[in-house]
Each structure stands twice: as C-alpha cells, then as structure tokens.
C-alpha cells in the first residue's frame, strides 16, 4: 500500500487544501463519502472508470453525465482532473486517502463495529463511549457492519486494537477450554 499512497496522497492533499481554502471541508467530506458509497455499490461504474480501453474524453463525459447533478463543482472538476491525468481508475483509493488525511488532521479515530444485528442508536452511543475511552481520542467516526455469523454481541476495531465481544467468540473459547 505504500506505493499506492505515494500516488494517492498528493491528489488527496490537494483536494483537502482546495476545500479548506474555500471553507468547504465538512461538505466535501460528506460528498466524498456519498461518492465512495455510490462507486462501491456499482462495480460496473468502477470497471468503466478503470478501463484502459475507454478514451479520457469518454470517461469525462460519463463522469459529467452521472455526477453533474449529484456533487458540487469542486468535486466534479477534481474527477475530471483525475480522468485527464489517467488516475480516475484509482479514484476510490484517492478518496479513501482524502478521508484518512482529514481524520488525521481533525484527530478523529475510525472505528469499525461489526454486529450480528443492526445496532440501535443507544447501543451505538454506548459502544462509541467505550471505544473513545480505549482509543484515547475525543472524536470518533463509527462504521457499522452486520455479520449474522457473530450470533450476538459485536466486534470493534480501532487501528490495531480489536475488541471481540461476540457470542461466536465466546462459544469458540468455551469449546477450546472444554477440549483441553
């Protein structure tokens, strides 16, 4: 990943600098998350943008057609620039790096919580408080995922720290202790 970061970081930093100067950082963060979600939910779009067969002008037309009404002009121009520079194929990596740099600069930790079922707002609040204490940060961005194989409970990860409070893990531990 360090090689990819050496390509993505300058673009991500440039986008962050432009939106910071225009006082659009928070708005851009929301739009980047929506754009990433849209691209990740549409594998065909990602393949199309990454295709070496399509001409740059065709990719730019596709970008304009799909995104001109959905994102602000700064982000649209950024996507067209990436197409011009033959970097649109790694747009998701660049946008992910943009969010990483934003979180680093804003002292926001990213936590992923996987649970067997959808968490309620109260549960998310309690888990967020626990993770903030463990991570030693004041701000936390919580990403939730659902994995029914956990049976119950949750698995949370922040950086290299993992909290496994899942029922599946407890059953596995019980099975190991009984087999001894």
UniProtKB/Swiss-Prot annotation:
Keyword terms of this UniProt record: ATP synthesis, CF(1), Hydrogen ion transport, Ion transport, Membrane, Thylakoid, Transport
Record membrane topology: Peripheral membrane protein
Any Gene Ontology CC annotation: plasma membrane-derived thylakoid membrane
InterPro entries with a match to the protein in the record: ATP_synth_OSCP/delta_N_sf (IPR026015), ATPase_OSCP/dsu (IPR000711)
Superkingdom of the source species: Bacteria
Keyword Endoplasmic reticulum attributed: no
Compartments where found: Cellular thylakoid membrane
One Pfam family this sequence matches: OSCP
Residues forming coiled coils: none
Keyword rRNA-binding belongs to the record: no
Gene3D superfamilies per UniProt: N-terminal domain of the delta subunit of the F1F0-ATP synthase (1.10.520.20)
Function: F(1)F(0) ATP synthase produces ATP from ADP in the presence of a proton or sodium gradient. F-type ATPases consist of two structural domains, F(1) containing the extramembraneous catalytic core and F(0) containing the membrane proton channel, linked together by a central stalk and a peripheral stalk. During catalysis, ATP synthesis in the catalytic domain of F(1) is coupled via a rotary mechanism of the central stalk subunits to proton translocation.
Family, similarity comment: Belongs to the ATPase delta chain family.
NCBIfam families with a match to the protein in the record: ATP_synt_delta
Subunit structure, as described in the record: F-type ATPases have 2 components, F(1) - the catalytic core - and F(0) - the membrane proton channel. F(1) has five subunits: alpha(3), beta(3), gamma(1), delta(1), epsilon(1). CF(0) has four main subunits: a(1), b(1), b'(1) and c(10-14). The alpha and beta chains form an alternating ring which encloses part of the gamma chain. F(1) is attached to F(0) by a central stalk formed by the gamma and epsilon chains, while a peripheral stalk is formed by the delta, b and b' chains.
UniProt name for this protein: ATP synthase subunit delta
Annotated source species: Prochlorococcus marinus subsp. pastoris (strain CCMP1986 / NIES-2087 / MED4)
Phylogenetic placement of the source organism: Bacteria, Bacillati, Cyanobacteriota, Cyanophyceae, Synechococcales
